Amino acid sequence: MIVPPDSAGFPEAPAIFAGEDLLCVRGERAIFAGLSFRLAPGGALLLLGPNGSGKSSLLRLLALLLRPAAGRLTWGGQAVAADPEAHGGRCHYVGHLDAIKPVLALRENVAFWAKLAGAGETHVDRALKAFALAPLATIPGRMLSAGQKRRANLARLIAAPAPLWLLDEPTTALDRASIGVLEDLIARHRAAGGMVVVSTHQDITLPGATVLALDHFAPDPSRAAGLFLEDEG
């Protein structure tokens, strides 16, 4: 049975995470505009849309790896841009590329995240057990299969507690059993007051999730053109 750390283990208590009238621009192309959301403790957002609609860009924006061209993000009513370090400590961004160091053993990779969060070896043990990785603990990252790397990357969700999970295509390379483990982990995280934003092309069970269809926020070309003219001026 998976038992992730409860809300008392979070570095910061969950609060309402919100975005208001967000505009995302990459290069000279507006990806989405006028996007707003409100995510309360225990909540989930499911991002849907065709390729190029901005699902990955939105997740990176929520992690402050990108900045909105307009609009703002708040945590508990306070602008997250005012303290990027604090926001980095309250969220896990798991991208579609696995952050596995090839020369480190699997356990060392997971322990790296636990150490950053101030968590101990018990968290690492639980993470490896949850994703059936304990037998592979001493295997170097470069020798892991795609599915094993993905499970190792997701194991940090248990090894390093954080209230906000931002998951980009988390089911990639996972078999049905591992997807079930992830679904259970997300459910327990939400029950403890945690929040999750998920982008996926595969079926994943997220009871009560708010669906955010990115193609509904396709930008008004005139608004994007106006932004570029202002920049040139």
UniProtKB/Swiss-Prot annotation:
Positions with a binding annotation for ATP: G49, P50, N51, G52, S53, G54, K55, S56
One Pfam family matching this protein: ABC_tran
Entry EC no(s): 7.6.2.5
Keywords on record: ATP-binding, Cell inner membrane, Cell membrane, Cytochrome c-type biogenesis, Membrane, Nucleotide-binding, Translocase, Transport
Record InterPro entries: AAA+_ATPase, ABC_transporter-like_ATP-bd, ABC_transporter-like_CS, ABC_transptr_haem_export_CcmA, P-loop_NTPase
Catalytic activities: heme b(in) + ATP + H2O = heme b(out) + ADP + phosphate + H(+)
Transmembrane helix recorded as keyword: no
Major place of residence: membrane
Coiled-coil residue windows: none
Location within or outside the cell: Cell inner membrane
GO cellular component terms attached to this protein's record: plasma membrane
One GO molecular-function entry: ABC-type heme transporter activity
Key word Membrane present: yes
Domain of life: Bacteria
Domain ABC transporter: 17-233
GO BP terms: cytochrome complex assembly
Matching SMART domains: AAA (SM00382)
Membrane topology: Peripheral membrane protein
Family of this protein: Belongs to the ABC transporter superfamily. CcmA exporter (TC 3.A.1.107) family.
Assembly notes: The complex is composed of two ATP-binding proteins (CcmA) and two transmembrane proteins (CcmB).
Function: Part of the ABC transporter complex CcmAB involved in the biogenesis of c-type cytochromes; once thought to export heme, this seems not to be the case, but its exact role is uncertain. Responsible for energy coupling to the transport system.
Annotated protein name in UniProt: Cytochrome c biogenesis ATP-binding export protein CcmA
Gene designation: ccmA
